[in-house]
């Protein structure tokens, strides 16, 4: 399989959002940058005149925009795979919805439901707070949709997805040059081990629902950042000192609200 760099894509400006299209030959990956208020990303996988979406937009204008894009492709829409982002259920109404039982629970009763409630309060009528109803539960560790095999990796909240045919992984968050939520040292170690696993497997591209497409160099950058967080936490006695030290080392990083949350976890 030919390796594709994260910059090897064509870009389609949809008005609000951007579509970055990666051509793997038999399979195309359409990475949708929503440009919404929570920097969501969604991923359309296309093969043999069929397609499905990994995660979905949750603002009504993005929903309309993406539906029009998919219609314009002239493909048969085979369903929506919902892992970490359960809101936006008006998208492609009537299409199959795939999820695991733990992800469905997370979206309807767990932390995902709480986030949706908060977003609905913050964003009002522009936000589609309706939660997807799962029509097709994924009970095994593999599933095939639109002729594309997916490997399912259950996580604490939901699940990650590997697409072996194009050597791509989808996980909730990475973001190599921004702060992210790190819930203490054990969580940092878990993320490091996860990213090292991607490196060992030689994964081509890493997809996440809050950042543009990334690669293994980005994974290495994130590992170094996480190691630094652990070191800085060991050297500082208060959350405030920790945040100052991290910001000094990573002054260009966005996501200071996530750094605040991380500090709260490290200094309980």
Regions found by a protein language model. Give the residues of each.
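Active-site-proximal loop/helix segments of hydrolase catalytic cores
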Residues: 147-201, 214
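Conserved beta-strand hairpin/beta-sheet module of binuclear metal-dependent hydrolase folds
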Residues: 13-68, 159-173
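C-terminal regulatory/interaction regions
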Residues: 2-5, 238-268
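Divalent-metal (often Zn2+) His-rich catalytic cores of metallo-beta-lactamase-fold enzymes
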Residues: 188-245, 251-252
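Active-site environment of divalent metal-dependent phosphoester hydrolases
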Residues: 38-39, 60-62, 82-91, 104-107, ...
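Metallo-beta-lactamase
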Residues: 4-18, 108-158
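Active-site metal-binding motif and surrounding structural segment of the metallo-beta-lactamase
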Residues: 49-51, 58-103, 202
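Second-shell loop/turn segments in exported
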Residues: 54-58, 180-185, 207, 230-233
